[in-house]
């Protein structure tokens, strides 16, 4: 869980920017999107195989 404390004399926009940066660095949002819907293990394997094939070429 990312936590951001608003500093003294810091605007809300700056604090929000720092929060967004910390969330993107930790990969929290990407992980939530990935786990939004259940994915069968066979589908996971297929996607992983296709991604490896894409990287190879």
UniProtKB/Swiss-Prot annotation:
Gene3D superfamilies, A to Z: Ribosomal protein S8
Family the UniProt entry places it in: Belongs to the bacterial ribosomal protein bS21 family.
InterPro entries, per database record: Ribosomal_bS21 (IPR001911), Ribosomal_bS21_CS (IPR018278), Ribosomal_bS21_sf (IPR038380)
Biological processes, Gene Ontology terms: translation
Pfam families recorded: Ribosomal_S21
Protein name: Small ribosomal subunit protein bS21
GO cellular component assignments: ribonucleoprotein complex; ribosome
Gene name of the record: rpsU
Lineage, highest ranks first: Bacteria, Bacillati, Bacillota, Bacilli, Bacillales
Keywords assigned: Ribonucleoprotein, Ribosomal protein
Keyword Flavoprotein: no
PROSITE patterns: RIBOSOMAL_S21
An example molecular function term from Gene Ontology annotations: structural constituent of ribosome
């Amino acid at each position: 869980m990312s936590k951001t404390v608003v500093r003294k004399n810091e605007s809300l926009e700056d604090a929000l920017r720092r929060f967004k940066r910390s969330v993107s660095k930790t990969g929290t949002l990407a992980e939530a999107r990935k786990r939004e819907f259940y994915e069968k293990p066979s589908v996971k394997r297929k996607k992983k195989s296709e991604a490896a094939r894409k990287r190879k070429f």
